[in-house]
Amino acid sequence: MQKRKISNSELNRLTPEEFRKANKNPIIIVLDNMRSHNNIGSIFRTADAFLIEAIYLCGITACPPHRDIHKTALGATETVEWKYFEKTETAIEELKSAGYIIYAVEQVENATNLDKLNINKETKI
């Protein structure tokens, strides 16, 4: 049995214009010196799916347009706002001054599982 690819309209995916106008979740993802272009594209795609406010790309993290990012982002670089910072610290300072709470995500010993965080709808992260 051959499987049919579902269209954007069947997925109820917003057009780029609709996405720009949509209410976003007050979350900004900061990518700190991420090397993998494919992972960067995947994060754009995930941010698009969850209506994330923006992505901040820092240091050596590649920026769109880039063919490897585009390949995995599947159009999300056209919808999700992004900004480049030479230094991650500058991005963090901007977010703190705008009232965001900063969380670092890393797989390390004694880390808190993301599903255990106590975050309410009004929290800007």
Which positions does each model-derived feature cover?
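Post-transcriptional modification and biogenesis factors for structured RNAs
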Residues: 1-125
